[in-house]
């Protein structure tokens, strides 16, 4: 849907918080999808801090745990041409924390679907909030 970036994201979608960074038109069609995400609509995305040991998505059961992970999370490592923070190319198992207006949630990448012959590329997540 609009807020996950798995459907062609409208960058002005009112409820969207995660944006697919699209394609690199300088590359051939079968390898041009960036598979990167950025925040939209005043949301902020962070990665799980590299200092966290023994992390287990399934073991997270309370919102205060998610807020702590967000507060201690790392900024996204890249910047797009608009100056927005952008992830690396995502991979299965990557973990992100999202905060928009105090609504904080945890997402883990469960699948990255790259399609070379159409524009149906997608990133699928599990979510906890």
PLM region spans:
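N-terminal "domain-start" segment
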Residues: 1-84
């Amino acid at each position: 849907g609009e807020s996950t970036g798995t459907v062609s994201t409208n960058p002005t979608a009112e409820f969207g918080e995660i944006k697919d960074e699209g394609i690199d038109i300088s590359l051939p069609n079968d390898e041009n999808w960036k598979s990167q995400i950025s925040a939209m609509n005043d949301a902020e995305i962070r990665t799980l801090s590299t200092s966290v040991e023994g992390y287990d998505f399934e073991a997270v059961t309370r919102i205060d745990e998610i807020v702590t992970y967000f507060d201690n999370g790392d900024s996204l490592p890249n910047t797009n041409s608009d100056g927005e923070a952008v992830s690396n190319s995502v991979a299965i198992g990557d973990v992100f924390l999202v905060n928009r207006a105090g609504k904080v949630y945890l997402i883990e990448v469960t699948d990255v679907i790259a399609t070379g012959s159409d524009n149906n590329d997608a990133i699928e997540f599990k979510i906890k909030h």
